[in-house]
Amino acid sequence: WIMGHMVNAIAQIDEFVNLGGNSIETDVSFDDSANPEYTYHGVPCDCGRTCTKWEYFNEFLKGLRKATTPGDSKYHEKLVLVVFDLKTSSLYDNQASDAGKKLAKSLLQNYWNNGNNGGRAYIVLSIPNLAHYKLITGFKETLTSEGHPELMDKVGYDFSGNDEIGDVAKTYKKAGVTGHVWQSDGITNCLLRGLDRVRKAVANRDSSNGYINKVYYWTVDKRATTRGALDAGVDGIMTNYPDVIADVLNESAYKAKFRIASYDDNPWETFKN
């Protein structure tokens, strides 16, 4: 999965997919009442990027729905996965469940079209703080009470705080999550980060009793870093330059081993060689 980073304006969906992305990451900020409000990152952000592009969250979802609904004039067949980077650090810990409930309602209405031919992309809820795991339970409860538990088949999870792998595993137990797990590792492109924790995550993914299904590394803009991540065995790379990742995947060393995921590739299944 080539994951376009910080896609917060509707116009950027086309831009990042046309550069080679089959996945996008979108920032979601919340108001004081835990309503998802804007797709907005703010300052500071990655080097070389504009930090302040934004939409109202529900409007972004409508644009995203068009981009992922077959037959729509804006449809992109290859856009198959969306990571919502949930900026919950503005919330109190006890608001996490409410944030999940309100997020589910927004997605149900504006993205899934109340279960009636909505957008088809798989969704990853990426949470920066282990203490906010009740966002997941609130989200699940709401889709169930609104009569659409089947949409949980399209939803996965990520804790993005670079926490100890063992602590993340314990948190998923508390949240009642037993699958659909992506594990991120990374840092802003302005700084360097080694691959030690990525390798630990990959080892967990490939062990018989691990909790991780997929591992992604962020934010990767350079060819050398891309090669390092691929050599470590990641499933996804988040980038400001999807074309750079696509180029490296075309190199003879990687062409035979990796391909770009399509809609038929289940993002919740651990890939077995």
UniProtKB/Swiss-Prot annotation:
It catalyses: an N-(acyl)-sphingosylphosphocholine = an N-(acyl)-sphingosyl-1,3-cyclic phosphate + choline; an N-(acyl)-sphingosylphosphoethanolamine = an N-(acyl)-sphingosyl-1,3-cyclic phosphate + ethanolamine; a 1-acyl-sn-glycero-3-phosphocholine = a 1-acyl-sn-glycero-2,3-cyclic phosphate + choline; a 1-acyl-sn-glycero-3-phosphoethanolamine = a 1-acyl-sn-glycero-2,3-cyclic phosphate + ethanolamine. Its cofactor is Mg(2+). Its main location: secreted. It is found in: Secreted. One of its GO terms (biological process) is killing of cells of another organism. Its EC number is 4.6.1.-. The active site is at H5, H41 (nucleophile). InterPro entries: PLC-like_Pdiesterase_TIM-brl. Glycans are attached at N250. The keyword Transmembrane helix does not apply. Mg(2+) binds at E25, D27, D85. Keywords: Cytolysis, Dermonecrotic toxin, Disulfide bond, Glycoprotein, Hemolysis, Lipid degradation, Lipid metabolism, Lyase, Magnesium, Metal-binding, Secreted, Toxin. Expressed by the venom gland. Disulfide bonds join C45-C51, C47-C190. One of its GO terms (molecular function) is lyase activity. GO terms for cellular component: extracellular region. It comes from the Eukaryota. Binds 1 Mg(2+) ion per subunit. Belongs to the arthropod phospholipase D family. Class II subfamily. Dermonecrotic toxins cleave the phosphodiester linkage between the phosphate and headgroup of certain phospholipids (sphingolipid and lysolipid substrates), forming an alcohol (often choline) and a cyclic phosphate. This toxin acts on sphingomyelin (SM). It may also act on ceramide phosphoethanolamine (CPE), lysophosphatidylcholine (LPC) and lysophosphatidylethanolamine (LPE), but not on lysophosphatidylserine (LPS), and lysophosphatidylglycerol (LPG). It acts by transphosphatidylation, releasing exclusively cyclic phosphate products as second products. This is Dermonecrotic toxin LdSicTox-alphaIB1aiii.
